[in-house]
UniProtKB/Swiss-Prot annotation:
Protein name: Hemagglutinin
Encoding gene (name): HA
PTM statement from Swiss-Prot or TrEMBL: In natural infection, inactive HA is matured into HA1 and HA2 outside the cell by one or more trypsin-like, arginine-specific endoprotease secreted by the bronchial epithelial cells. One identified protease that may be involved in this process is secreted in lungs by club cells.
Miscellaneous comment text of the record: Major glycoprotein, comprises over 80% of the envelope proteins present in virus particle.
Species, as recorded: Influenza B virus (strain B/Fukuoka/80/1981)
Main location: virion
General function of this protein: Binds to sialic acid-containing receptors on the cell surface, bringing about the attachment of the virus particle to the cell. Plays a major role in the determination of host range restriction and virulence. Class I viral fusion protein. Responsible for penetration of the virus into the cell cytoplasm by mediating the fusion of the membrane of the endocytosed virus particle with the endosomal membrane. Low pH in endosomes induce an irreversible conformational change in HA2, releasing the fusion hydrophobic peptide. Several trimers are required to form a competent fusion pore.
Gene Ontology cellular-component annotations: host cell plasma membrane; membrane; viral envelope; virion membrane
Length: 345
């Protein structure tokens, strides 16, 4: 922290703070900080950046994609960085879901955190012959498929008893690990409930049903709610008096999960296989151009200085470091006033 003294006859507008001498006037400085201005978000230079989970799935929310809504099936590109762009709670445009009863809205965020995400090509269990069956796999007019016929989510099978429409004690199904590359397996499941008349018609039991899932040391319990739902439609579909509750469990490589259920279960089918890590940051779409850094408050930044002032928030990439006050590097000498000539005596 040594500033060499020199002599200059010019004024010195530059002041730097030093550790040993406090504020010191110097003949020159190099600014080390910048104050960014807000900009659009961009692709992170040198890496793949993910905006929507499925860029080619038109008119689909990320929750639609995560649940396998029939018209929202597509490839999720790999990415080292992901934009959390759906800042408000979103719904799925299929069968009405009771979103607030589980953590299901977190599913798209969970998937964003992985670099590689793919949907399994086969079903994790044979739902038609699961315990308590045989079952007819239910579909809904509120969830049209690509040919506009009745459909349902690819990640779940709506298990409606074929002939044995009676109450049942809790049943257990094991959910095997079927991913093939050592990935995390994200298994989606749930249950359906309706008013008493519909519950008797579909399942032969109008009482609340009990459900439990267990995987990776995490166990979750639910009891279904019977009736009391107004007719509701999602995305222009057929109004429904029933509701579904949807949850998920994460299975580590080689680990089996279990689901204990009664009537109305939505058994897991296609599962997500996910690996690697993708850094996630809140932002907005579309992504325009490229940037050195993605900042939650300022968007895409190109690094022109090593430090910045302004709003402090999460940032990813080659980013400047946040500081409270501007920093300067002295590249001149300590300023000294011009010497005064002695008067002749």
């Amino acid at each position: 922290d040594l500033i060499c003294t020199g002599i200059t006859s010019s004024n010195s507008p530059h002041v730097v703070k030093t550790a040993t001498q406090g504020e010191v006037n110097v003949t020159g400085v190099i600014p080390l900080t910048t104050t960014p201005t807000k900009s659009h978000f961009a692709n992170l230079k040198g890496t793949k950046t993910r905006g929507k989970l499925c860029p080619n799935c038109l008119n689909c929310t990320d929750l639609d994609v995560a649940l396998g809504r029939p018209k929202c099936m597509g490839t999720i590109p790999s990415a080292k960085a992901s934009i959390l762009h759906e800042v408000k709670p979103v719904t799925s445009g299929c069968f009405p879901i009771m979103h607030d009863r589980t953590k299901i809205r977190q599913l798209p965020n969970l998937l964003r955190g992985y670099e590689n995400i793919r949907l399994s090509t086969r079903n994790v269990i044979n739902a038609e012959w699961a315990p308590g069956g045989p079952y007819k796999i239910g579909t809904s007019g509120s969830c049209p498929n690509v040919t506009n016929g009745n459909g349902f989510f690819a990640t779940m099978a709506w298990a409606v008893p074929k002939d044995n429409k009676t109450a049942t004690d809790p049943l257990t199904v094991e959910v095997p690990y079927i991913c093939t590359k050592g990935e995390d397996q994200i298994t989606v499941w749930g249950f359906h409930s309706d008013n008493e008349a519909q519950m008797v018609k579909l399942y032969g039991d109008s009482k609340p049903q009990k459900f439990t899932s267990s995987a990776n040391g995490v166990t979750t319990h639910y009891v279904s709610q019977i009736g009391g739902f107004p007719n509701q439609t999602e995305d222009g579909g057929i109004p429904q008096s029933g509701r579904i509750v949807v949850d998920y469990m994460v299975q580590k490589p080689g680990k089996t999960g279990t689901i204990v259920y009664q009537r109305g279960v939505l058994l897991p089918q296609k599962v997500w296989c996910a690996s690697g890590r993708s850094k996630v940051i809140k932002g907005s779409l579309p992504l325009i151009g490229e940037a050195d850094c993605l900042h939650e408050k300022y968007g895409g930044l190109n690094k022109s200085k090593p430090y910045y002032t302004g709003e402090h928030a999460k940032a990813i990439g080659n980013c400047p470091i946040w500081v409270k006050t501007p920093l300067k590097l002295a590249n001149g000498t300590k300023y000294r006033p011009p010497a005064k000539l002695l008067k002749e005596r």
